[in-house]
Amino acid sequence: MRKSFDDLTIADDFMFCKVMQNEGICKEFLEMVLSNKIGKIAYLSPQNSVAAGIEAKSIRLDVFVKNEDGKSYDIEMQVSNEYNLPKRMRYYQAAIDIAFLDKGEHYKALNDSYIIFVCLFDAIGKGKPLYTFENICIEDGQTPLRDGTKKVIINAQAFRKAENKELKGFLEYVKTGTVNTEYTGR
């Protein structure tokens, strides 16, 4: 059964993509989640498919933007837990890298990238509102690989535990529909 427009929430794919097409909202979201200023952004792919090859599984990106430094950000809304998010993020990263590195180009040409999933559930199961991952040396637990990739899983279910007021308000809005910050009121 299809929902009417008035019944859509930010968690609905259509509405999430429409809201994130507002450059100010999308930029502020990224800065809030990553705790960094990211500069001007440009949209690369509003809900476009990316295929790694003719017979490869394609992916459909909800929101795909790049900042003025060349970093790319894939933002996805995930409503149901299919228990495959880490591997799905891995595949998305690989498909994006393949799609944006042309034959003959050096690997150095790969831009830094972030894969961000906003989830209505706790995909990792540790009760945190935000999980940020990058490749780290197992032997010393601190040396980064510096491959330019980060993966972020946002758990709207844990909105009460978010320390940043704006992030807490956004997560509560995603989970419950309650508007209580300037950001979510836009």
Model regions: which residues?
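Elongated, amphipathic alpha-helical interaction scaffolds
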Residues: 1-186
